[in-house]
Each structure stands twice: as C-alpha cells, then as structure tokens.
Amino acid sequence: MEIHLESQEQEMKYQSQIWNQICGTVDTSVLRCAIQLGIFDAIHNSGKPMITLTELSSIVSSPSSSSIEPCNLYRLVRYLSQMDLISIGECLNEATVSLTGTSKLLLRNQEKSLIDWVLAISCEMMVVVWHELSSSVSTPADEPPIFQKVHGKNALELAGEFPEWNDLINNAMTSDTSVTKPALIQGCGKILNGVTSLIDVGGGHGATMAYIVEAFPHIKGAVIDLPHVVEAAPERPGVEFISGDIFKSISNADAVLLKYVLHNWEDTECVNLLKRCKEAVPADKGKVIIMDLVIDDDDNSILTQAKLSLDLTVMNHGGGRERTKEDWRNLIEMSGFSRHEIIPISAMPSIIVAYP
C-alpha cells in the first residue's frame, strides 16, 4: 500500500532526515579530517578570537604534505559550521573562522580533549567492522564479536601485538578521563571517605588513578592491567602498576574501581569479575566503584543517543553491552552484593557503587 505523506513540506523534512542519515559517516570523516589537518589547533594557537580563511589555509597542513586548496578548505569549514564546530563570520569582505564551545573539546595539549577518542573510533581497523553490523546482530552472546572475526583476534589481543593499536586504545581512555575528571572527583568525594587504598581494575595507563590520588592524597592507589599495558604505562606519582589477569586475581584494597570495563563483557564474565572484586574488598566496609553508562530507554535526549551509539559500538567491536538501571541491578545482585546505588554525574558515565 502506498504511503501518502501529509504535505510537500513534511515530505521534504522526511527526505532531509533520511539523506542526513545516508551520509552519516560524513560527520565522523569530517571530524577526523579536521583533526588531522589541525584546523581547531590552528585557530586556537593563533592567539586571536578569529582568523581569516586565508590565514587558516596558510597554517594547516595535510598528512600528505601537499598544499591546501582554499576552495576545498572552505567547503570543509562550511560543513564544520553545520556541525557547530566552527563559527563562520566575515571581516573586510573576507570569510573568518572561530572556535565554538564544542570544538574546544577537540584541541591538543588541553586539560580536556577528546581528540584521541575521535582518532580511535574513526581508525580503519574500527571502521571496517561496521560493514559487518548485520552479522553482529545475528551473533549469539557466547560467540566472539565480529571484530574478532574480521581481524582474527579481539581488540585486547591485537593490542598486545601492535604497540600503535595499544597506544590508540589507551590514549582514547586517557582522553576520556581528562573530560570526566571534574565530575569523577566531585562524585567520588563522599564515596572515598574512609578509603585508604584503591585499586583500578583494568585501569590502563593510570590516568584516572593519578587524578584520584592527586585529589585524595591519603589514598594509596594501584592499577592492575595486562602486562603489555603496564609495560607501556608512564610513571605516575603515587600510582603502583601491577601486571596481571583481572579475571584470575585482584589485590586486596579498601575499594575497587572499574571504569569502562564491564561494558566490554556480557553478563557471565561481568559476574565473575564482580565476584573477584567483592573478594578483594573488606566485607564490612568495602566498596566496588563502577564508572559506566546507564541507559534510560525513555529518554530521547542527545546524551541518550550518544550512549546508544556506544552500545552498538561495544556490541559490534567488543561483544559487550551498555546497561539500563534494571540491567545493573540484576548484574550486581547476581554477583552477590547486598545493595548498590547509582549516582549521576555531569559526564557520560554514572557512578555505581556496589556494597558487599
């Protein structure tokens, strides 16, 4: 049966929406290109609130070392403007460009930057797996994720073999930590009261733990991760690094931190890991602190859309899942904890505290 649309105006709205979704990969490609060219940094490092397009074209450089074509640069900047990442103006009949509040999260050498997340998510090794999403939808939870079928090994195994991939992953996690740091420290204030030792399970290069021991110097901090991760980790004051398999052994501490770890696994693996964490903390006053996404299926905000995008990413690339409040309740109860609380913070993840 033919569907009759309400009006020409409504039909154009529907067509525009579909065309934007058809070309959805353009957003990621443009974002990656802008970072590779150094567009945001060029504007910021100029020391001026805005620069002309001519100035920008003389500053930025392509990875191939070839010169920039001003007309093509303008077309790229025009699209970045539609993404609210660049503001286009005019001065003395010449186009000018300036940063927006959003693009300030895409600068290098800043306290808050998501550049490394962009580069990791948009790299060829990640992008090629999206072509197999339909296969991922039909893959049972007990089978390897599509990433492993495409590349022959899972992401962690590849990280152990290829230093550049290992750096890409860990730099992305450090990048996320830089953005969530203020909310994390604020949200953990009461939670860490009375905690003298904390171990970050799967804590990568230790950026999160470094922030915590700096904010709470009374805490003895440690990070446990795979040997190839620990070997590449930089020295951090007040942070001890431990090589090991988090599914086999976790050192004892007053509290355990799991930041963006459980979303990489299905429930069975998560329960096993949470039980290990429960054994590592005191039964009377121990805490297992989880930083992970909490999805609200009834919320249609841009934040929820971002969370759902990450849910499909971990499904397709890692074989894990993002979880709702009910999912977290069931998971924590299955792991034998007596109670838990979910604390929203001003960041993508929430803080979930499980008590033995």
Swiss-Prot record:
The active site is at H263 (proton acceptor). Its EC number is 2.1.1.117, 2.1.1.352. Keywords: Alkaloid metabolism, Methyltransferase, S-adenosyl-L-methionine, Transferase. Highly expressed in capsules. Expressed is stems. Expressed at low levels in roots. S-adenosyl-L-methionine binds at M173, T177, G202, D225, D245, I246, K259. Pfam families: Dimerisation (PF08100), Methyltransf_2 (PF00891). SUPFAM superfamilies: S-adenosyl-L-methionine-dependent methyltransferases, Winged helix' DNA-binding domain. Pathway: Alkaloid biosynthesis. The keyword Metal-binding does not apply. It catalyses: (S)-scoulerine + S-adenosyl-L-methionine = (S)-tetrahydrocolumbamine + S-adenosyl-L-homocysteine + H(+); 3-O-acetyl-4'-O-demethylpapaveroxine + (S)-S-adenosyl-L-methionine = 3-O-acetylpapaveroxine + S-adenosyl-L-homocysteine + H(+). GO terms for biological process: alkaloid metabolic process; methylation. CDD domains: AdoMet_MTases. One of its GO terms (molecular function) is protein dimerization activity. Substrate binds at D176, Y260, V261, L262, H263, N264. InterPro entries: COMT-like, O_MeTrfase_dom, Plant_O-MeTrfase_dimerisation, SAM-dependent_MTases_sf, WH-like_DNA-bd_sf, WH_DNA-bd_sf. Belongs to the class I-like SAM-binding methyltransferase superfamily. Cation-independent O-methyltransferase family. COMT subfamily. Homodimer. Forms heterodimers with SOMT3 and 6OMT. The heterodimers SOMT2-SOMT3 and SOMT2-6OMT possess 3-O-acetyl-4'-O-demethylpapaveroxine 4'-O-methyltransferase activity, where SOMT2 is the catalytic subunit. Homodimer does not possess 3-O-acetyl-4'-O-demethylpapaveroxine 4'-O-methyltransferase activity. Methyltransferase involved in the biosynthesis of the benzylisoquinoline alkaloid noscapine. Catalyzes the conversion of (S)-scoulerine to (S)-tetrahydrocolumbamine. The heterodimers SOMT2-SOMT3 and SOMT2-6OMT convert 3-O-acetyl-4'-O-demethylpapaveroxine to 3-O-acetylpapaveroxine, where SOMT2 is the catalytic subunit. This is Scoulerine-9-O-methyltransferase 2.
